[in-house]
């Protein structure tokens, strides 16, 4: 009898890659809001008027606002909310960066752990990660640069719709067109402007509220800058905690997380929280590895000891609930009225709820079998492989082609009733998402992979080991 080899189980962090892929879809969905509004408004262009229009004059927007409670249902809210997804991205980055450190510290005696050994083990990853993120962020601005200079992209599209004055609570991300740079007279001036924006990627210690923080050719890169800044803070904290016991580390980190949230920081507390989750997950990971090595237990039947999956499912549900907290008028959301009454936004801002939810999701998802299988599925893994590329390329494509695509789809299907509206929406969404995936696949193959190889080679050539 021929025995087929047993399939290799997914790695202990494969679900993290799948989760990143799912989060990339959520970010894509979040940036569709103004696209849908302008695409719908194109179907009945407004008459020229000297006074600015209210965004609520658009029937689709007015209908959505009148039915706002439907869009605040937990889980449904997560499907199109960028803030919780960004928070979870930051927590994941801190988790992945710290997991290697936690494994190293658990296997290395304190007496033999020296700063030199730590820098030798982790210096390469810090160098490669920082350089790789910078190079890819700069490369992602090339296509928007061409679109702006050739005149294909028009940053005044919102003004041409008459929406020149937007109330802060009613912007629906329509102001993001203004974040792009103006078209310069010559190619040389435009190239110099691009160079200045590339330099912004490196200046990670500028305050996020400053105009110079976000590179204008790809405004989503503000998260990359925040990620780089938090990763440097995390690396310093790793070194500072070398001689600290595990329990004391967790206490110090918890204090850092609380203080960071209290002063309004976003990325650093989430990175430190990711480290805490890595510290908590590591013992269970070691038990699982020992079980897999045991001859008495086949690999595919390995059981996971640890907290009750039902309890973790409850924690996951609570995390999703907190992450779904509305940023606009939470008092009008039926399922959040009690929470908002007990803890007003003045005490705990919406983004803090998103951070707490992200931490709970990262902590619990690993031990919820159904959620983990979804993240380890082939589709999620494919999206995870291309998640960074999707994040980098989707924004300029969505705002450049999205409004016209949705207008075309609704022109074909109609938009007078819910059925025809949904058909047109589905067609436009599918075409746009496939286009973004194709662009991301090309970016991953022809930009991301070569950049990774270039960074690896540069590190090998620059390493002190070459001088020995």
Swiss-Prot record:
**Disulfide bond positions:** none
Q: Cellular component terms, GO, for this chain's entry? A: membrane
Top enzyme class, one word, equals transferase
Domain of life according to the entry: Eukaryota
Task: Kindly name one Pfam family recorded for this protein.
Answer: Acyl_transf_3
Q: Keywords in UniProt for this one?
A: Acyltransferase, Membrane, Transferase, Transmembrane, Transmembrane helix
Induction text: Expression is induced on squalestatin S1-producing YMG medium.
Q: Where in the cell is it found?
A: Membrane
Membrane topology recorded in Swiss-Prot or TrEMBL: Multi-pass membrane protein
Where are the coiled-coil regions? none
User: What InterPro entries does UniProt report for this protein, alphabetically?
Assistant: Acyl_transf_3_dom (IPR002656), Acyltransferase_3 (IPR050879)
Any idea of its EC number? 2.3.1.-
Q: Name one GO molecular function term.
A: acyltransferase activity, transferring groups other than amino-acyl groups
The pathway entry for this protein reads as: Secondary metabolite biosynthesis
- The principal localisation class reads membrane
Give TM regions: 21-41, 70-90, 133-153, 252-272, 308-328, 388-408, 423-443
Function recorded in the entry: Acyltransferase; part of the gene cluster that mediates the biosynthesis of squalestatin S1 (SQS1, also known as zaragozic acid A), a heavily oxidized fungal polyketide that offers potent cholesterol lowering activity by targeting squalene synthase (SS). SQS1 is composed of a 2,8-dioxobicyclic[3.2.1]octane-3,4,5-tricarboxyclic acid core that is connected to two lipophilic polyketide arms.
- What protein family does this chain belong to? Belongs to the acyltransferase 3 family.
PANTHER family registered for this protein in UniProt: ACETYLTRANSFERASE, PUTATIVE (AFU_ORTHOLOGUE AFUA_4G08520)-RELATED
Q: Kindly provide the name given to this protein in its UniProt entry.
A: Acyltransferase R4
Q: Which species does the entry assign this protein to? A: Phoma sp. (strain ATCC 20986 / MF5453)
């Amino acid at each position: 009898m021929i025995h087929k080899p047993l399939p290799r189980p997914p790695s202990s962090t494969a679900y993290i890659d799948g989760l990143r892929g799912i989060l990339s879809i959520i970010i894509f969905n979040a940036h569709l809001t103004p696209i849908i509004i302008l695409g719908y408004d194109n179907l009945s262009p407004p008459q020229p008027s000297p006074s600015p229009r209210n965004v609520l004059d658009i029937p689709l927007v007015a209908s959505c606002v009148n039915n706002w409670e439907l869009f605040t249902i937990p889980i449904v809210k997560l499907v199109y909310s960028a803030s919780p997804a960004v928070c979870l991205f930051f927590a994941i980055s801190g988790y992945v960066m710290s997991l290697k450190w936690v494994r190293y510290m658990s296997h290395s005696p304190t007496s033999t752990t020296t700063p030199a050994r730590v820098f030798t083990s982790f210096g390469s990853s810090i160098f490669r990660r920082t350089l790789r993120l910078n190079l890819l962020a700069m490369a992602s601005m090339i296509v928007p640069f061409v679109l702006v200079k050739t005149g294909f992209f028009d940053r005044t599209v919102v003004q041409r719709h008459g929406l020149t004055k937007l109330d802060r609570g009613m912007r629906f991300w329509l102001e993001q067109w203004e974040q792009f740079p103006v078209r310069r007279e010559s190619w040389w001036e435009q190239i110099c402007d691009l160079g200045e924006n590339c330099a912004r990627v490196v200046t990670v210690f500028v305050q996020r509220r400053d105009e110079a923080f976000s590179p204008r050719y790809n405004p989503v890169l503000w998260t990359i800058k925040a990620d780089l800044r938090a990763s440097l803070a995390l690396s310093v904290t790793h070194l500072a905690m070398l001689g600290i016991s595990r329990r004391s580390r967790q206490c110090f980190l918890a204090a850092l997380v609380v203080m960071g949230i209290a002063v309004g920081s976003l990325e650093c507390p989430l990175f430190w929280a990711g480290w805490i989750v890595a510290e908590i997950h590591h013992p269970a990971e070691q038990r699982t590895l020992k079980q897999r090595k045991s001859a008495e237990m086949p690999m595919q039947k390995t059981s996971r000891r640890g907290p009750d999956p039902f309890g973790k499912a409850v924690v996951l549900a609570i995390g999703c609930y907190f992450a779904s907290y509305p940023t606009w008028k939470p008092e009008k959301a039926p399922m959040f009225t009690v929470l908002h009454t007990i803890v007003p936004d003045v005490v705990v801002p919406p983004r803090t709820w998103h951070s707490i939810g992200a931490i709970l999701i990262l902590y619990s998802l690993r031990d919820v079998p159904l959620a983990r299988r979804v993240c380890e599925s082939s589709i999620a893994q494919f999206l995870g492989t291309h998640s960074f590329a999707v994040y980098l390329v989707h924004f300029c494509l969505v705002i450049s082609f999205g409004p016209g695509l949705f207008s075309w789809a609704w022109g074909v299907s109609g938009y007078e009733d819910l059925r025809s509206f949904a058909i047109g929406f589905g067609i436009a969404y599918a075409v746009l998402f496939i286009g973004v995936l194709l662009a991301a696949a090309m970016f991953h193959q022809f930009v991301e992979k070569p950049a990774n190889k270039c960074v690896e080679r540069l590190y090998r050539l620059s390493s002190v080991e070459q001088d020995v």
